[in-house]
Amino acid sequence: MAQATREYGEWPLKRLMTEVVGSGHKSADDMSRTQAREAFRRILGDEPDHTTLGAFWLANRWKRNTPEELAAYVDVMAEESVETATPEADPVDCGANYDGKGRSAILGVGAGVVAAAAGTPVVVHSGDRVPTQKQDAYKHVLDELDVRTEIEPSESADMIDEVGFGFYYQPAFNPGIDALFERRDNMGVRTFVNTVETLANPANASVHLGSFYHLAFAKKMVRTLVQSETSNVERALFFQGMEGYDDVRPGETVVAEWPVTGEESDDEDIADFEIRTGEYGMDIESEDLQVDDIAGESAAITEAVLAGEREDGFADAVALNAALRIYAREDADSIQEGLEQAREAIADGSAAETLDDLRAF
């Protein structure tokens, strides 16, 4: 313990449990930035025993992390685990949940490629069967499309610059988080790691795109980005997504963007507004996007939509999700203008050509 104290400080996880976070969701205290930083440094350093780590993760889950705590975790992850590789292009960083989807098609590959074909570079990142759900994610759709995924960060950056769309593989760019796989798997529930890994931003992008179930989560993510000392994000767009993924939910859905300009606004304010996806051509229900074989069918849908061979609800959903990426980077003044760019990229064949380039990389 003496060596741990010299190396890390005076807040081992067991002490944080007994004195700060471990008394229950109503009476627990929040950690200071210093305490949260030390906790995550110890976790990434494999210092806590499994029982103490599990208890700490559960205590954080029960009390709910503050933006300051999450920002501290993001900063430690950036300093001690993430290997960034910055492309010349400044892509939209898509932070989808790493543990994947289990009911509906993954549309972000198709949407990202369409956006890239329209001139908006896009970066996505994921692992391989990440706990807790261990379901299909970006990697698995790309694998089905015969796109290289198990590549080094420098190659991922080159992919963005050469193709306009790039994929970063978690074991390659974020090995410290990847090393926690077994412990996370044994937990059986999500932890704060599921949140902070989506903010890893391996391409050092200035624009982040994410999703939420409740608007309060989007506000917390913005405050986390603002309070992070390592984040390069200058603009963020969030929307209500399907299964926690960055595929917009059909119907009436909330979109939130940051920053907000104006004299009355502070650094952490967000602007939120409702859209009806049917007004953008996506006039379907969530059930219409369900598939049985998530990776395989998502890949087949992606290929057909980009080739102009489908004009159904999936095609409309891919186009609108591409539009949101284009709008996020401010390559269009409105979502509608982004949608027009996306549809043109599909119609003129450039989206299919971009997919060919991605496969050839």
List PLM regions with ranges:
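Short, structured segments at the rim of ligand-binding sites
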Residues: 9-12, 19, 67-70, 131-151, ...
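Predominant activation on well-ordered alpha-helical scaffold segments within soluble catalytic domains
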Residues: 18, 22, 37-41, 54-58, ...
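Acidic, glycine/proline-rich low-complexity segments that act as flexible tails and inter-domain linkers
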Residues: 1-102, 116-118, 122, 129, ...
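Glycine-rich anion-binding loops and their surrounding alpha/beta cores
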Residues: 2-15, 31, 86, 162, ...
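Contiguous N-terminal and early-domain "leader" segments and peripheral loops that mark the onset or edge
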Residues: 56, 143-162, 166-173, 322
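A generic, well-ordered mixed alpha/beta core segment in the N-terminal half of proteins
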Residues: 90-159
